[in-house]
């Protein structure tokens, strides 16, 4: 049976459903092919970081997630004693949201379906091939029938063992695991007083966070078990023994609902695009799960790719736009792999290692150092290469935080509210600006700032991308300001034939 969609996503985890939602709000006919008939009940990831929360806020769905999670104003770097302080960061979401991945996935799947995405669960992708004009995806449906989908693009969001990546023959260089650790979702009859614990001694490291009123995630890194193969099952007795040795108590650990062993393998796809095929999330990059960053970076991949694919499909993308996905997101994941490798090296239980950890913890107590590292973990410091065809500006390529605006009619609105439909926003901060520019996919807003903002001082106009990054900004002092703005609009809205 032959079916047609404009875009096919292989992999129905959080990244796949985030991408499907982005395509759907742009009116792109999309389907998701997911091997599992039902979502996995356990959760690998537990946290959504500030930048991811900003993206959800841009689409007007943040409260759905916040209502089911718990806000934590801090994060951690390599389980050091000094926590990362998110509360002072320049964001409307200065916290980590503790929310199990299973709930995140459910919310994103529901959102994607509500926007019209078709989901094939219990379906296995067998072959993904392309020519210059289309992609053919052959899959086995849950009833055993073999179907073929023809689409303009396909995206592999199908995890570390990605079928899409392998069939596209995209290299996945990196390193295999050299150490392993264990985790368990358990009941603790005598939990830590605050419910949260991060501890490292010469006997190993432990992290404990609450999942629900009666269940906790326990992570143990034992120097005596780091060479245990990943496929060796974790036992309740192992977790209890390690807790007792490291913490002096096993906290009354009982009733594990899920236990797993994980390693520090680190790999990254050599390229994120091969013609009409793209990779996102774990299909593009894997790493040691330090700092809870992997899911977040994957969701940010989806947010970067969605509007670009939609523009290409609708015929409004300049020729260079699709290549910019790799150019922007590959370096972002390189930074992720660097900082998680650094965190892995810091998890050292020798005497020298503990001294190094103590010194690093002291350094994190300096506000500037803490802010720098927090910017990396939160992904708020991700900045894309500036558009070199436009005059240099300190804002070009940076994310733009949410802010209160006073509109020309005197009413106030939050900046992110204008991004809910996934369009570009041309924000003019001068009342004399031309607010009659009409370009499909561009919303023009003339406003003033409700509060002084040094970063925006003397700025005339900003073109804000659908993912909240600044495409370009023009200062009021720029020569031929109006001409430069028109040039910038033409640069990003070059009309092409539909692909």
Swiss-Prot record:
Record organism: Bacillus subtilis (strain 168)
Protein name: Uncharacterized aromatic compound monooxygenase YhjG
Major enzyme class: oxidoreductase
Gene: yhjG
GO biological process annotation, one example: catabolic process
SUPFAM superfamilies noted in UniProt: FAD/NAD(P)-binding domain (SSF51905)
Binding positions for FAD per the UniProt entry: 6-35, 272-282
Its EC number(s): 1.14.13.-
Domain of life: Bacteria
